[in-house]
Amino acid sequence: MTRLSACLAVLLALAPLALAQSPADTVRAGQYDNGKMWTFDFPPLDYFEETYGLTLDDEWLTTARMGALRIPNCSASFVSPSGLVMTNHHCAREQITAVSRPGENLLDDGFYAQSMSEERPAPEMYAEQLIRIEDVTDEVLAALEATQTDAERADARTTAIDSITARIETAMGDAFTAEVIALYNGGRYSAYTFRRYDDVRLVMAPELQLGYYGGDADNFTYPRYALDMTFFRVYND
């Protein structure tokens, strides 16, 4: 008998014993074990109330949605009525470097505008605010009814989405962008309308050693002793 055959024989002999001694499977999957991120239009309100004792109404959800922002490769939040925006330090490093003047290294040294006139415009920086969510599922699926092949369905879907996007952006004006999002593996399509702010200025950024204190090892560790933040301000022309 070879060594491999001997090992297999031992494993087969021990398998029934291991199964007999194993306790019954007591693991039960929770309702949201696969993730706890939801769209603004379908939050699990009953779950929030039963689990956390938190009762949310439409006004609260609208305030949360209007306070959330999308910036290049990151998210951010409005934190004042005067357009002040807060995000993570790493989300702003490119902009911090871009507004540094000759002889300055604001990424390493930090920046603070003592008045609004000292805030520095960040080139190619923008912020987008989700102002409306529209269910366009019926419109997209209707465009697929006459299709027969996967290629035809893909083309029809793209055409329908482009048409919806163009219609919304034409109706809303230049300050707005639209994006159709496919959800639930194509079971639902939502048209998101964003208010876009292109005049974004740097207000405050700590020096890199404070903003990145602890590095990746400390990320998502609490309490965490770092000034992992940057402040911008958006201006509405």
Where are these regions (language model features)?
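Bacterial N-terminal signal peptides
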Residues: S5-P16
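Terminal presequence/propeptide segments associated with secretion/organelle targeting
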Residues: L19-D237
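N-terminal secretory signal peptides that target proteins for export/translocation
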Residues: M1-T2
